[in-house]
Amino acid sequence: MTRPLQFIPFKSRADKGWAEAWELYEKSFPYNERWSEEAYDRAFGDPNFEADGIWRGGEFIGILFHWGADGYRYVEHLAVSPALRGQNMGTAALSAFCRKVGRVILEIDPPEDDISIRRRHFYERLGFVANPYQSLPPSFRKPFTPHRLVLMSYPGAITYEEARSFADFVREAVLRYSEHEAPALPKLP
């Protein structure tokens, strides 16, 4: 019998497992899509933000960093330990998270190569829908360059108004932890 996954929020960088989580984070996401550790020090106190370590028994499985907004959770970062990839840990973690929280929005790279196409199919198998709205948020780190992303939502599509509200949320709640002094509004085409 497999042990259930647990989502245990980190409250500080001193918490058990943060070093493993940070190493996975740095290996899984490009520099411009990552915050600094100092930004996490500030974000840990934000009631809208949760940086979960994913655990099975005492074993560190991965990370799921997410935000609470009005009517949905925004999954900002999800990664599974490389040693456990291919064992459906990402599927199990995201499925459990979606069942628990309901409505979820996330962003992915446009499906333009094998990896990004597989990533989109992964989310679609879990019930996510690609929306016709692209977001262009600036990177978290200098130099600030917009990065075109596809909005995906669970369990169904979002409206243009919801996409606009999401863009406002990213600008007002999320980008304040980036290196931006006055983040520009992510634009929807």
What are these regions (language model features)?
Residues 53, 58-68, 72-79:
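Conserved beta-strand in the GNAT
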Residues 1-39, 149-151, 162-188:
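Short amphipathic alpha-helix that is part of the acyltransferase structural core
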Residues 100-115:
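Conserved GNAT acetyl-CoA-binding A-motif
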Residues 78, 83, 107-111:
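Short strand-loop junctions, especially beta-strand C-caps/beta-turns
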Residues 130-169:
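A contiguous, mid-protein "functional segment" used to position or interact
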Residues 80, 86-99:
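Conserved acetyl-CoA-binding loop-helix of GNAT-fold acetyltransferases
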